[in-house]
Amino acid sequence: MMLEFSEVRLAPNFVDYMQAWEMQQKLHDAVVEGQAPSTVLLLEHAAVYTAGKRTEDHERPFDGTPVIPVDRGGKLTWHGPGQLVGYPIIALADPHAIREYVATLEDILIAVLAQFGIKGERVDGRAGIWLLADAKGPTRKIAAIGIRVHNGVTMHGFSLNCDNDLAPYGQIIACGITDAGATTMELETGRNISPAQVLPHIIKEFSAREATLIGAPAHEAVVPARATEGATQ
């Protein structure tokens, strides 16, 4: 099966988190059963905080803002306008190669950033994509990754800061990290870069890696019926 892409909604028609979560669940079940192709959902959320399973109480919003618990690995993060979110629902070619899948997501994000003149990096021991300390500031995070794999099919995914407001990060300990901040593509380049502008580049990079990502329909693969949390946030 070929990898498909679904542009759910971008600004100004932001997607409620729970609506997107229901879409993920239904699509995941269909991919597991071989009733739908592997698909990447691409969208912008209405503002929301979500908490992975490792989130601690002291990391939650200081003002008591509600947080939605989710079944990915990782900790607390924010999604909202100006941030491109991708939920790849993919029957993996190798259902056990979780680290390799996360590395592929990192490669995709790094390649997209490079097309806008931004040098994204991996940082040992920390998930996501970073900009290393330079004249513009200390090491800072520009993209988060948080996944779950169940029955050989992925859920959740990545978020890439395009032109979003960073103020919401000031209300939380994002991703459990206290010694680094966040940034956006707009801040790094001095140009307005919206999720709509970035989306075609994401599709291009996923498509280039399609052959290594996608396996047989999950219901045909021999996969233990268990969930696996991946490196996140």
Swiss-Prot record:
First-tier enzyme category under EC: transferase
GO cellular component annotations of the record: cytoplasm
Main location per the UniProt record: cytoplasm
Pathway participation: Protein modification; protein lipoylation via endogenous pathway; protein N(6)-(lipoyl)lysine from octanoyl-[acyl-carrier-protein]: step 1/2
Functional description taken from the UniProt entry: Catalyzes the transfer of endogenously produced octanoic acid from octanoyl-acyl-carrier-protein onto the lipoyl domains of lipoate-dependent enzymes. Lipoyl-ACP can also act as a substrate although octanoyl-ACP is likely to be the physiological substrate.
Protein location: Cytoplasm
Family of this protein: Belongs to the LipB family.
Signal peptide interval: none
One example GO MF annotation: lipoyl(octanoyl) transferase activity
Source species: Renibacterium salmoninarum (strain ATCC 33209 / DSM 20767 / JCM 11484 / NBRC 15589 / NCIMB 2235)
Protein name: Octanoyltransferase
HAMAP family associated with the record: LipB
Known EC number: 2.3.1.181
Gene field: lipB
